[in-house]
């Protein structure tokens, strides 16, 4: 983590699915908005950059390994982050968890002083790591992640419990062990106990503010 002043601070938060990435990102966002003002900070979710699959049938889309780096368009994410750092606005794609592909809509995203990235595979790509001013890995036990994922995917994403468990056994856990967990070595900060770790939240907020003022 650099001590120099930044015109745009990019924070990357990685870790297993349902490890608390979104919660800690949203908490930091809400608390920094109160200090920096609206429009100064934004959150970008790696999930938005899942590849377009409109050319595939629904049966084929369901079989996609969404926990492998190839499922994500990191080229576009790197391009968008580079544009934002230069001061250019971008259009972030939107992804449908029920249709398993990109939606027609995009979300305009203007340059911000602070950008929080959150996603399972962010630290596996050296280009993304190079763009980050600080990187965090959420080190939450897999059994806790599975329980959270079951609740989330059934209640919020229209999944069945059986489909969630099959996906976990087939791709989620194996890909975590192959790609996500090894990427922990690239993190500047490893956060235990999930997204409600108050000490970690306060530390990250202080670090972000320090980087903004130099």
From Swiss-Prot:
GO cellular component terms, A-Z: cytoplasm
CDD domains hit by this protein: UMPK
InterPro entries, per database record: P-loop_NTPase (IPR027417), PRK/URK (IPR006083), Uridine_kinase (IPR026008), Uridine_kinase-like (IPR000764)
Keyword annotations: ATP-binding, Cytoplasm, Kinase, Nucleotide-binding, Transferase
Catalytic activity entry: uridine + ATP = UMP + ADP + H(+); cytidine + ATP = CMP + ADP + H(+)
GO biological process: CTP salvage; UMP salvage
Entry GO MF terms: ATP binding; cytidine kinase activity; uridine kinase activity
Pathway, per record: Pyrimidine metabolism; CTP biosynthesis via salvage pathway; CTP from cytidine: step 1/3; Pyrimidine metabolism; UMP biosynthesis via salvage pathway; UMP from uridine: step 1/1
Subcellular location(s) of the protein: Cytoplasm
Binding site for ATP: 15-22
Protein name, entry field: Uridine kinase
EC number: 2.7.1.48
Family named by the database record: Belongs to the uridine kinase family.
